[in-house]
Amino acid sequence: GGYIRTDAIYDFNQLGNINQFRPESIPTPNLDVSNYNMAARASRLTLESRTDTKWDVLRTYIEIDFVGPGNTTELRLRHFYAQLRNILVGQSWTTFHDSDVIPETADFNGPNSWIFQFNPQVRYTHRLAKGQTVSISAEQPSSGIPRINPVTAQPVSSTSPLPDFVVRYRYETDDYHFNTAGLFRSVGGVRSSGQSDHVFGYGVMASGLLRLWGRDNIVFQAVYGEGISRYFIDPKNLNLDAGYDSSGLLKAQPAYGGYAAIQHFWNE
């Protein structure tokens, strides 16, 4: 399966990123140059299988798009996982993410504060009661820190001694759903001298969807934490999980964001 999507963008004052609205890429001072761009990078290909086993149905899912690095059209793996009953193994949305509250914006990037991360992981989901589930996962970590300690001038290599751990609770009815999650991680690196610097990072997230009349709905998401910038779509590649203070010590950086959106259907 999949679909073809083509974006045509005319920018009156050219952004640093010609394909998406990424505030972190806006040049300073602004460029007084217009630009037109057309791309089909957001098109997707999917493949799903369901196989009967003696335990239950084994589901596998693969999804790719063409949003490669540096505005290229290289293949990008979004999902590649196997799921049997309550256990998921492979790459998918981080458990810290709520895929039901993504606003349908004209720009593929979406709100710059929403949680956007595909992680290799092992996830277990337990049904508590009707409409209530709890999920726990151990996920691939990655420490976004400066590559140079500005005080000692030593090169630093990022390291992550532990998986990122996520716990999520979800409550859902026919009229609304509410989702909250906690993220716990270790962020750090090793200096060229061999000294290791690691700090604790955490995040909390709340999101939800409320159905109005017909198919209209309101969605929201709010996030706060320290050492979690890689989970936000806009600053995820800026190495802002942690930074060095004036004493050369590594400190987790606070990060927070949120949005709300309403979706209205003009016809059936």
Where are these regions (language model features)?
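Detector for outer-membrane/organellar transmembrane beta-barrel domains
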Residues: 172-268
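Long hydrophobic alpha-helices with heptad-repeat/coiled-coil character
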Residues: 119-170, 236-268
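Outer membrane beta-barrel
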Residues: 1-20, 28-145, 161-162, 166-177, ...
